[in-house]
UniProtKB/Swiss-Prot annotation:
UniProt record similarity statement: Belongs to the class-II pyridoxal-phosphate-dependent aminotransferase family. Histidinol-phosphate aminotransferase subfamily.
A GO BP entry: L-histidine biosynthetic process
The keyword Transferase appears for this protein: yes
GN (gene name): hisC
The entry's keywords: Amino-acid biosynthesis, Aminotransferase, Histidine biosynthesis, Pyridoxal phosphate, Transferase
InterPro entries: Aminotransferase_I/II_large, HisP_aminotrans, HistidinolP_aminotransfase, PyrdxlP-dep_Trfase, PyrdxlP-dep_Trfase_major, PyrdxlP-dep_Trfase_small
GO molecular function: histidinol-phosphate transaminase activity; pyridoxal phosphate binding
Enzyme class per UniProt: transferase
Pfam families hit by this protein: Aminotran_1_2
Catalytic activity entry: L-histidinol phosphate + 2-oxoglutarate = 3-(imidazol-4-yl)-2-oxopropyl phosphate + L-glutamate
Subunit structure, interactors included: Homodimer.
Listed EC numbers: 2.6.1.9
Cofactor: pyridoxal 5'-phosphate
Name recorded for this polypeptide: Histidinol-phosphate aminotransferase
Length: 356
């Protein structure tokens, strides 16, 4: 701490990002990155954009990228906001749309950046407990609030809501913004984007970090009513009018345009996830029904922290949270078939040795 810090900084509990080891000989299954490289067209577009024009500022409106998003999702350009990763998009949404007198509602077990934003912007926060099956009960969100923020699928559980449940929430809270964070939606859940035209209080936030394999590029976007998008732009232009550089805009536009690559790659990950779930259950793990690019699992007879440490000794990294209610769970990114085979073989060895 420092006497130069503001009171807000003194009160902050910052987000703790997933570990990014410098070693290269690891099986890295801890931060839900894609096991496959980015779309080739995205890499080509980035190389082509790395020219003399980098001396110029990037397009502050990201028009080319927004056009690609509009075509991919059949929405208008004025319904799209883009930012430097979905984390920045979410931060602007919290700042622009969710600061009210009543508390903001989020699940109690969810993306841990949400309470950080609340602390940063002075937003009262009311976590809503998941049920005993680790599911979101939409009836629990029928209460006075500043708004709702729900990831779909949820993280770290991987469990998704159906569109009917999301529509129920939107109808129950017509005067509050409902933010649906779709970071993992391409791995089997239904997007809420078709509901945007019917519900002016809906903001859908997405990222290219997961299904498009561009975590290192930092590109996210939101789709919603033009009034919501205008609010986000007002905050952006009061903070940083140029959030996306030229390379990011070019690469992201090319990635979004390649729908065939997206379908093929997410299909491979879904298939591997099904196999990984089956293998883990065969080892005695309880595995939640995931529609994301990770699984959430626990073993009834083994300590999760011990399992994570034992895997690390074998150069395999998974995510263990020490948070109440989930301290006995591991979140495991779906890697390649071979990476998942090595993981389950290692777990089999660990469990057998512990049993002796």
């Amino acid at each position: 701490m420092s006497r130069f810090w503001s009171p807000v900084v003194h009160r902050l509990t910052p987000y703790v990002p997933g570990e990014q080891p410098k070693l290269t000989n690891l099986i890295k299954l801890n931060t839900n990155e894609s096991p496959y490289g980015p779309p080739p067209g995205a890499l080509e577009a980035i190389r082509a954009a790395a020219d003399d024009t980098l001396r110029l500022y990037s397009d502050p409106t990201s028009e080319r990228l927004r056009a690609a998003i509009a075509q991919a999702h059949d929405v208008g350009m004025d319904e799209i906001f883009v930012g430097n990763g979905s984390d920045e998009v979410l931060a602007h949404a919290f700042h622009a749309l969710l600061q009210h007198d009543a508390p903001l509602l989020t699940p109690d077990i969810t993306y841990s950046f949400y309470p950080v934003y609340c602390g940063l912007y002075g937003i009262a926060h009311q976590p809503v407990p998941l049920d005993d099956a680790m599911r979101i009960d939409v009836d629990d969100y029928r209460r006075p609030c500043a708004g709702l923020v729900l990831p779909n699928p949820n993280a770290p559980t991987g469990i998704a809501l159906g569109l009917g449940q999301i529509e129920t929430l939107l109808r129950a809270q017509p005067d509050r913004v409902v933010v649906i964070d779709e970071a993992y939606v391409d791995f089997g859940a239904d997007t809420a984007i078709p509901l945007v035209r019917r519900f002016p209080n809906l903001l859908v936030v997405r990222t290219l970090s997961k299904s498009h394999a561009l975590a290192g590029l930092r590109v996210g976007y939101a789709i919603g009513h033009p009034d919501l998008v205008e609010a986000l732009n007002r905050v952006k232009d009061s903070f940083n009018s140029y959030p996306l550089d030229r390379l990011a805009q070019a690469g992201a536009a090319a990635a979004i345009a390649d729908r065939e690559w997206l379908a093929r790659t997410t299909g491979k990950i879904i298939k591997t996830r099904i196999g990984l779930t089956s293998s883990l259950r065969g080892l005695g793990f309880e595995v939640l029904p995931s529609q994301a690019n990770f699984v959430f699992a626990r073993h009834p007879d083994r300590d999760a922290a011990h399992l994570a440490a034992a895997l690390r000794e074998r150069a395999i990294i998974v995510r263990h949270f020490r948070t109440p209610r989930i301290a006995e769970w591991l979140r495991i990114t779906v890697g390649t078939d071979e990476e998942c085979r090595v993981l389950t073989d290692a777990l089999g060895t660990i469990l057998t040795r512990n049993a002796d």
